[in-house]
Amino acid sequence: MIRRLAAFSALSGLATAWLPEVNKKITSTNGTNLFTSSNGKIRGVNLGSQFVFEPWIAEKAWSDMGCGGQKSEFDCVSRLGQANANSAFASHWGSWITQDDIAEMVSYGLNTIRVPVGYWMREDLVYSDSEHFPQGGLQYLENLCEWASDAGLYIIIDLHGAPGAQTPQNPFTGQYAPIAGFYQDYQFEGALKFLEWMTTNIHQNDKFRNVGMLEVVNEPVQDAGKVGSMRSSYYPNAFKRIRAAEQSLNIDRNNYLHIQMMDRLWGSGDPNESLTDTYYAAYDDHRYLKWASVAVSKDSYISTSCSDQLNSNTPTIVGEWSLSVPDNVQWNSDWSPDSNKDFYKKWFAAQVTAYERQQGWIFWTWKAQLGDYRWSYQGGLLLTRPGIGDQQVLTL
């Protein structure tokens, strides 16, 4: 179905795109293949709050930027003014995720990063009289992708913040919008222009050489009846526009980007409903038992995760998940992270085992300022040190 390509060369003229090990082997600059120990499965982390800041993740960093009390990037830029905001966000972009972070991820056996970005990274799409977002992020995205590519990490770029906001009152869209304004033709057009632009950057800039997947929108409204236009118009046009951009660059079909959508289980309908071509389509599911209709007990969480089949569109990557439990119990003695490490190790193992029945997993998130490893892969690492490939860790 998909032929295996020759080993990746970091010195190739145009960057390429693929699923690692399925379509192509990739290595770091020193020749290490991070996917060997995972049998090709994706084992990754999200870089939450790097380019789309979610204040709940890092309240101190948010306050230090001068954004304290603001709900979203839009609100902070409005408050600080463009020039001051650009300076504050540049400082954040240069310090939140560093090259040392990338090296640490590799040392823990991870092989993939998912990078949430907003459409405003293409700055000519922003209505400057009514939209307020930081400027200058592309340079920092380039640097990050170069570090990750040199380290041999696979990279997924995710349109986390869509024009008009794809869901209301949520800072992960970059704004705290009262309604989901994304589901209109002119907003779709803005997102499509972003996808074309990002596709061209990925293929023409060698710093993006390990970007193999582009997610066209993160977490749309979970009501299939309200987002029919996304399935009938936006998804098919995203495929057409991305492929047209690749064809204009004479990219070989085997080097196309995988185009990722939320899967049917997410609740926004079947993403394939109006697609006429699913070549190099990929799918994303987010699995937070914290908010699921599951009995709140340790046995229930373990058994649910052990039996989780996630039968849906394929190939599916579980692109977000965590170890957090419901707010009303999360700091009780029965659930506190400090006194229940053995349970959380077992639950971690149960989840990754289930998700590797699919294409793999990406934990939310790499780092946070919560003092809680249930949301921060870096923050405890009692779970994975010295590496996720350690069979002792993965045994229930």
From Swiss-Prot:
Subcellular location: Secreted
EC number: 3.2.1.75
The organism's place on the tree of life at top rank: Eukaryota
Active-site positions on this chain: 219 (proton donor), 320 (nucleophile)
Signal sequence, renumbered to the chain: 1-17
Keyword tRNA-binding in record: no
Keywords from the named record: Carbohydrate metabolism, Cell wall biogenesis/degradation, Glycoprotein, Glycosidase, Hydrolase, Polysaccharide degradation, Secreted, Signal
Pfam families referenced in this protein's UniProt entry, alphabetically: Cellulase
Molecular function in Gene Ontology: glucan endo-1,6-beta-glucosidase activity; glucan exo-1,3-beta-glucosidase activity
Reactions listed under catalytic activity: Random hydrolysis of (1->6)-linkages in (1->6)-beta-D-glucans
Recorded GO CC terms: extracellular region
InterPro entries: Glyco_hydro_5, Glycoside_hydrolase_SF, Glycosyl_hydrolase_5
Residues with attached carbohydrate: 30, 272
UniProt keyword annotation of Cytoplasm present: no
GO BP, sorted A to Z: cell wall organization; glucan catabolic process
Broad class of enzyme this protein falls into: hydrolase
Main location: secreted
Similarity remark: Belongs to the glycosyl hydrolase 5 (cellulase A) family.
Function: Beta-glucanases participate in the metabolism of beta-glucan, the main structural component of the cell wall. Acts on lutean, pustulan and 1,6-oligo-beta-D-glucosides.
Name of the protein: Probable glucan endo-1,6-beta-glucosidase B
Organism, scientific name: Aspergillus fumigatus (strain ATCC MYA-4609 / CBS 101355 / FGSC A1100 / Af293) (Neosartorya fumigata)
